[in-house]
Amino acid sequence: MAQGTLIRVTPEQPTHAVCVLGTLTQLDICSSAPEDCTSFSINASPGVVVDIAHGPPAKKKSTGSSTWPLDPGVEVTLTMKVASGSTGDQKVQISYYGPKTPPVKALLYLTGVEISLCADITRTGKVKPTRAVKDQRTWTWGPCGQGAILLVNCDRDNLESSAMDCEDDEVLDSEDLQDMSLMTLSTKTPKDFFTNHTLVLHVARSEMDKVRVFQATRGKLSSKCSVVLGPKWPSHYLMVPGGKHNMDFYVEALAFPDTDFPGLITLTISLLDTSNLELPEAVVFQDSVVFRVAPWIMTPNTQPPQEVYACSIFENEDFLKSVTTLAMKAKCKLTICPEEENMDDQWMQDEMEIGYIQAPHKTLPVVFDSPRNRGLKEFPIKRVMGPDFGYVTRGPQTGGISGLDSFGNLEVSPPVTVRGKEYPLGRILFGDSCYPSNDSRQMHQALQDFLSAQQVQAPVKLYSDWLSVGHVDEFLSFVPAPDRKGFRLLLASPRSCYKLFQEQQNEGHGEALLFEGIKKKKQQKIKNILSNKTLREHNSFVERCIDWNRELLKRELGLAESDIIDIPQLFKLKEFSKAEAFFPNMVNMLVLGKHLGIPKPFGPVINGRCCLEEKVCSLLEPLGLQCTFINDFFTYHIRHGEVHCGTNVRRKPFSFKWWNMVP
């Protein structure tokens, strides 16, 4: 039960006070008691509940009431059963007794009022009265937790605008309202109560730039909503009529959790006594609701695909046909960014990552725009953000970034359990250097801080700076599986590739050619690849780098060797001794449910079939997966990327609700 104010009574004159339903009000009967009195009794109107905490009563009176010793150890508290119909209609009488004095009486006239600020703290999608049931001032995680949730209103319902909805002080329409959380103020008072009292809605100055509150002034029409709290207004006096009244507010978050903002916002209603115009307003009662801003959540390859994105560039028609066919098989929507918009920047994966935000009443996809800002820089803002599709970005928009700030370097695992700790939404994975140096690269700290601040997908930092491009999607991927943990981790493996080529040579296929059928590309025999000492040394180094990540992933994702599949792949060291794929990197695949779009490796053809494709199919098809090998050699591979780099996927949000986890 909420704590009310302290009421002091005196025999000299009647005391008038307000008691809010659902609060426990302390009654001071000692400080003004007559000097010669040693005990007291209390009688109250039927609408008042009096509780006295002490030892046994001093004496039982003939009328049935009891007396208690008058000492500071006695605690007297009041609660109200019902709201008053008129001012001061509930009475409490305190009678003081002394051994040589007649009884002395003190009168207290109470006005019971109902004032309740309600939000969806039970996370059911509906606002329910919570007076005297739950403490709305705390926010707790877990299936038994409580606390209201806010969405950052980061979509753009007005197609004529270039800004997010949260960047203005207006409510566009009912769709805009649905992106906000409802909060209701319920009051029940005597008709004349607000002649001498007023209500103020307020937010801490440290949080005022993180939230905006609109008041529905006429019903629930969006056109009749006016802003009352926000970056310019930390408080607002409310015009509330007496009697029984409900007032609706719509609340939107303006910022995601980040290193300087834990994501919690407290809105408070204060009841002020304004009866004496010569004195400052006095606080009678406060009620607060704590909201948590919904985090941005990534979706792993194991989530069902809903929409595929790719770019149209010069001479990639065949690539797009293959992606289109794959999307149709997976029953996905396909969005193509035309050449005139992408400015010959085909790296759709690097430009953005599509996740979502969720409250009990609304789920919203949100595109996270990387700070790379190349040819595709306008695509997330102009073509992805829109009605019910949000937008967020972090990091410097000009300069100060590296290749590791592109989102091919940002992945997320499927749900895992690690040493008894559950990660029901998986864990974020991004690449970094193994130690800082003048030559090392790392993901920008602003991006790292943002990802960590979301709390629900605790990030794991991998080692990817050994790669020329430096992205984690160059050596790992996840695919769904029907058994074990529900997925497999795929890792690029030079060791597996050398083993396969050695087996083929042992069977008499040493003359078989890599890159056969690729124009203007030097073909290489299996036997020459196996005897190339420099290439062996390069891949020995790469294997050690991948093995480092292998052990890190096993430890941080709780994986066993049986959860990992090695995909045969060779690398070569180029400028600055950084690695890049020797042939199209098959682990850099597009995963659409059971349909996989894998870079065509152009491996040695043996008995009419590419031995690399055959090996990969033998590893993945037993899991119920269908492998489609896509030719990306000239349009993507030679430009240091593959199928995954050139595509992006919006996936179905988790059925698991993020607020039910414990970070």
UniProtKB/Swiss-Prot annotation:
UniProt: Ca(2+) 3 binding residues: D165, D168, E170
InterPro entries tied to this protein: Cupredoxin (IPR008972), PAD (IPR004303), PAD_C (IPR013530), PAD_central_sf (IPR036556), PAD_N (IPR013732), PAD_N_sf (IPR038685), Prot_Arg_deaminase_cen_dom (IPR013733)
Residues where Ca(2+) 4 binds: Q349, E353, F407, L410, E411
Comment on pH dependence: Optimum pH is 6.5-9.0.
Activity-regulation annotation: Strongly Inhibited by F-amidine and N-alpha-benzoyl-N5-(2-chloro-1-iminoethyl)-L-ornithine amide (Cl-amidine). These inhibitors are however not specific to PADI4 and also inhibit other members of the family. Incorporation of a carboxylate ortho to the backbone amide of Cl-amidine results in inhibitors with increased specificity for PADI4: N-alpha-(2-carboxyl)benzoyl-N(5)-(2-fluoro-1-iminoethyl)-L-ornithine amide (o-F-amidine) and N-alpha-(2-carboxyl)benzoyl-N(5)-(2-chloro-1-iminoethyl)-L-ornithine amide (o-Cl-amidine).
Gene3D superfamilies xref list: L-arginine/glycine Amidinotransferase, Chain A (3.75.10.10), Protein-arginine deiminase, central domain (2.60.40.1700), Protein-arginine deiminase, N-terminal domain (2.60.40.1860)
Positions with a binding annotation for Ca(2+) 5: E351, D369, S370, N373
UniProt cross-references to PANTHER family, sorted A to Z: PEPTIDYLARGININE DEIMINASE, PROTEIN-ARGININE DEIMINASE TYPE-4
Descriptive protein name: Protein-arginine deiminase type-4
